Curated annotation (Swiss-Prot):
The keyword Glycoprotein applies. This is Amygdalin beta-glucosidase 1. One of its GO terms (molecular function) is amygdalin beta-glucosidase activity. Its EC number is 3.2.1.117. Signal peptide: none annotated. Keywords: Glycoprotein, Glycosidase, Hydrolase. Glycosylated. The lineage of its organism: Eukaryota, Viridiplantae, Streptophyta, Embryophyta, Tracheophyta. It catalyses: (R)-amygdalin + H2O = (R)-prunasin + D-glucose. Monomer. The keyword Glycoprotein applies.
Length: 16
């Protein structure tokens, strides 16, 4: 997750 691209951030963020 840390090494993964900033996709999780956009997804979570967006969801939140």
């Amino acid at each position: 997750a840390k090494t993964d691209p900033p996709i999780h951030c956009a997804s979570l963020x967006r969801s939140s």
